[in-house]
Amino acid sequence: MFCEQCEQTASGNGCHQWGACGKSPEVNAVQDLLVYCLRGLASVVLKAKEAAISTREADIFTCESLFATMTNVNFDQRRFTDYIQRCLEIRENLKAQLGSLDWSALANYQPNFNESLVSQGQEVSLELIEKVQDLDIFSLKLTAIYGVKGLASYTFHAQELGQEDDSVYQVIQETLVAIDRSDLNLNDWVAICLKVGAANLRAMELLDQGHTETYGHPIPTNVPLNPRLGKAILVSGHDIKQLAALLAQTANTGITVYTHGELLPAHGYPKLKEKYPHLYGHYGTAWQNQTKEFAKFPGAIVLTTNCLMPPHENYESKLFTLGPVGYAHINRLETVDGAIDFSPVIAKAQSLLGFTEISEPRQVMVGFAHNTVLSVADTVVNALKQGKIRHFFLVGGCDGAKPDRNYYTEFVEQVPEDCIVLTLACGKFRFFDKQLGSIEGLPRLMDLGQCNDAYSAIKIALGLANAFNVSVNEIPLSLIISWYEQKAIAVLLTLLHLGMQNIRLGPTLPAFISPNVLKFLSDTYHLQPITTPAKDLADCLG
């Protein structure tokens, strides 16, 4: 087994015996085989694009199946086998349309489904590239492929909402093809990684456009953290479209719907809240706490995307997955006439007790996306000019189980009272319910949204830079980023593409980044690891 794609890799050096995420070596091998087949499909897709043959089916499939290979998404070996079979079907269909061409061995690769796909996957592990490549090029290849996985996930969600851009699909397919090239040097691979970052910026823009055109621009909204009496369904993940579909199917059933994890920002979308008043509150915190939180939740639970952990027996019967998410023997929701059928979830929720007690009211506020913040840009600019606001800190990203992630809580607690904290993604659950007060009517803690709402953070940063007529690196903003999985890698590549400097990254640096690549990032972008809250705060504030 070889996997270095997440922050919690074994001993910080990669998983080689069993995945820290809970993924077995067998599942990992079949997952690697899928990625290998996708690399072969990509070469055919690019030829088809040159010939003006439609590749939309292949592009969408590539995004979904890459999404499935991300950390904490799919643990089901059978599902990966299905993806491989479908990959080959799409590939051969495109080849038939292209006619007789001289295809590479990879484009003609055919696994033997009568023999172990595990052993065949082990034969095409990414680790084998390391044995024949320069370590630094291998490092950047891993950066590119892990970044493309994150890019594919955002592209998948944007496409669900009717937002697509062929140039994004092109970058995904070109990057997959590049993995098997041996003629590219270090500078070429730096350029490829930055191109992934540029495409990811476009994908996040498309997703933002899909969300806001469908559900309205987020507005500041108070979200209850205490449940109300009655039957309940909990929805976790990132997929707001599937949350909306569930809300439509649960209307007038008496069931209350709660968000979990990265779906907290859904409460800020006005059209969603106005149309579905039974979208009531938020339950729980970040993904790594789900085994305790799901066990206590007295209703049905739906996982729309990552992060799924290996489920415990005491709640697996009420857990449902959909889309790219999967786990062997766990209920899977099927698509009927192009839409997910949530009736099994509704039936399960109605069979369970639901909440029978209420607790003391608590709430948090969401909805501070770019439209909201930039609408008060004059207030922000004046407060900065008058010295009432000294500095902005973006403290956010992924959460995880490591104790050293307490750094982010302590950092926010130590931020001076004349500074504002922007946050996003599940890293916010370390401090999302803290009462930090306000400056000039502006909350000192603003939740920008999901991880893909890094787009909002970028829009806000560029807006402030424009207001002061300076570069984005000259505004009083520091990026204190926590990472865990491949979406965070894609976002980091986007920030580097934009030339953003002095990013502090933690809690540890990626295992796939070689010493020389790290030195390049440090020298070029001043990318640096977090140290202690006190030291980093002092350095940021000068």
Swiss-Prot record:
Cofactor note: Binds 1 [4Fe-4S] cluster. Binds 1 hybrid [4Fe-2O-2S] cluster.
Disulfide bonds: none
Cofactors, names only: [4Fe-4S] cluster; hybrid [4Fe-2O-2S] cluster
InterPro entries (alphabetical): HCP/CODH, Hydroxylam_reduct, Prismane-like_a/b-sand, Prismane-like_sf, Prismane_a-bundle
Residues binding [4Fe-4S] cluster: C3, C6, C15, C21
Gene name for this UniProt entry: hcp
Gene source species: Microcystis aeruginosa (strain NIES-843 / IAM M-2473)
Protein name per the record: Hydroxylamine reductase
GO cellular component terms given for this protein: cytoplasm
Gene3D superfamilies in alphabetical order: 1.20.1270.20, 3.40.50.2030
Lineage, uppermost ranks: Bacteria, Bacillati, Cyanobacteriota, Cyanophyceae, Oscillatoriophycideae
Localization terms from the record: Cytoplasm
